[in-house]
């Protein structure tokens, strides 16, 4: 039983960085550490929106299995490097951007070589993309989108221009989440929980921002249980039993003895509290089979007796 006198839990930010955060919530009633920690972990890993590369266009490249003269890496390696690109959209309404890169060798091409774009920040500018030899050139356009979860290349189908290569997109900015539940005490009570959450992100979203978003997502979904209007919209209509014809309505309340059943069958039904035709018709064949003493022959006897009165058992 929940203790109404237990003071409100205290939320503490133990560690907060751009890519790692540790948070503590205590004291909690016994069991609530796991009750809160597990869904928050799942939401953090699956449902926090982020950004990812969704397509790549490279000048003079027809497909991802090509090679580029004067470039050490093949196209597959370049795309794998680009998938590690971490981009932060500073404008919440921004949904997609195209990053442009033009480079000539000899040169090590890094993420910092993309041309600047308003409201866009590259979080890992030292990311290696390609190595150009003397005379090598690399001109590319990289599309970055905002999204949620994992979307394979064939699903999002983004192809802004001919020869653009779609890329599998992992949008989640949360790299890893761990939670730990430990015993804690408050006064004389020693049976309380302390929940510790550790969150790692790619830096495009801070751990605290990710946690706040996860809490809002969980809160929003929990309101569906307490909002009667939402429940009324979502709930399917209850199936209504067809009304019996007026001439049969009176017979529904007849005692079972009026059906002319054998003493053995009648006794088995009455042992289960079935006293009337109406109560018998509320059961289906499976229900009747589960009654001790009611076998296949007894079922046939019951069905025939009901049919004589114009009734049929539910399957």
UniProtKB/Swiss-Prot annotation:
Q: Where is this region: Alpha N-terminal domain (alpha-NTD)?
A: 1-229
Which GO terms of type biological process are on file?
DNA-templated transcription
Say which species the protein is native to: Thermus thermophilus (strain ATCC 27634 / DSM 579 / HB8)
Going by the UniProt record, its keywords in alphabetical order are: DNA-directed RNA polymerase, Nucleotidyltransferase, Transcription, Transferase
Q: Which molecular function terms from Gene Ontology are attached?
A: DNA binding; DNA-directed RNA polymerase activity; protein dimerization activity
Q: Which family does it belong to?
A: Belongs to the RNA polymerase alpha chain family.
Looking up NCBIfam families in the UniProt record yields: PRK05182.1-2, PRK05182.2-5, rpoA
| Catalytic function, reaction form | RNA(n) + a ribonucleoside 5'-triphosphate = RNA(n+1) + diphosphate
| SUPFAM superfamilies reported for this sequence | C-terminal domain of RNA polymerase alpha subunit, Insert subdomain of RNA polymerase alpha subunit, RBP11-like subunits of RNA polymerase
Instruction: Supply the name of the protein.
Output: DNA-directed RNA polymerase subunit alpha
Q: Write down the InterPro entries for this protein, in alphabetical order.
A: DNA-dir_RNA_pol_insert, DNA-dir_RNA_pol_RpoA/D/Rpb3, DNA-dir_RpoA, RBP11-like, RNAP_asu_C, RNApol_insert_sf
Which EC number(s) are documented for this chain? 2.7.7.6
Q: What does this protein do?
A: DNA-dependent RNA polymerase catalyzes the transcription of DNA into RNA using the four ribonucleoside triphosphates as substrates.
Q: Which GO terms describe its cellular component?
A: cytoplasm; DNA-directed RNA polymerase complex
Q: Which residue ranges traverse the bilayer?
A: none
Superkingdom field: Bacteria
Q: How does it assemble?
A: Homodimer. The RNAP catalytic core consists of 2 alpha, 1 beta, 1 beta' and 1 omega subunit. When a sigma factor is associated with the core the holoenzyme is formed, which can initiate transcription.
């Amino acid at each position: 039983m929940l203790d109404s006198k237990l003071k409100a839990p205290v939320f503490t930010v133990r560690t907060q960085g751009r890519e790692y955060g540790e948070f503590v919530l205590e004291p909690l009633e016994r069991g609530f550490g796991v009750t809160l920690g597990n869904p928050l972990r799942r939401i953090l890993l699956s449902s926090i929106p982020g950004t990812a590369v969704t397509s790549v266009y490279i000048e003079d490249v027809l497909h991802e299995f090509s090679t580029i003269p004067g470039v050490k890496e093949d196209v597959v390696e370049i795309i794998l490097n680009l998938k590690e690109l971490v981009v932060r959209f500073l404008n919440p309404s921004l949904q997609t951007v195209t990053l442009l890169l033009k480079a000539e060798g000899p040169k090590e091409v890094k993420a910092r070589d993309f041309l600047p774009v308003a409201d866009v920040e590259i979080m890992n500018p030292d990311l290696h993309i390609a190595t150009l030899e003397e005379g090598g050139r690399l001109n590319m356009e990289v599309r970055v989108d905002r999204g949620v979860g994992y979307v394979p290349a064939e699903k999002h189908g983004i192809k802004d221009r001919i020869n653009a290569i779609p890329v599998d997109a992992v949008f989640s900015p949360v790299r890893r989440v761990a939670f730990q539940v430990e015993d804690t005490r408050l006064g004389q009570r020693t049976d309380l929980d302390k929940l510790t959450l550790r969150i790692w992100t790619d830096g495009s979203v801070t751990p605290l921002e990710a946690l706040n978003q996860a809490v809002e997502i969980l809160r929003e979904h929990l309101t569906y249980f307490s909002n009667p209007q939402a429940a009324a919209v979502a709930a399917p209509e209850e199936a209504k039993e067809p009304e019996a014809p007026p001439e049969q309505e009176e017979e529904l309340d007849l005692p079972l003895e009026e059906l002319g059943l054998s003493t053995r069958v009648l006794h088995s039904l009455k042992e289960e509290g079935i006293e009337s035709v109406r109560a018998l018709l509320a059961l289906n064949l499976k229900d009747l089979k589960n009654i001790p003493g009611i076998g296949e022959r007894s079922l046939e006897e019951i069905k025939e007796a009901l049919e004589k009165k114009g009734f049929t058992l539910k399957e």
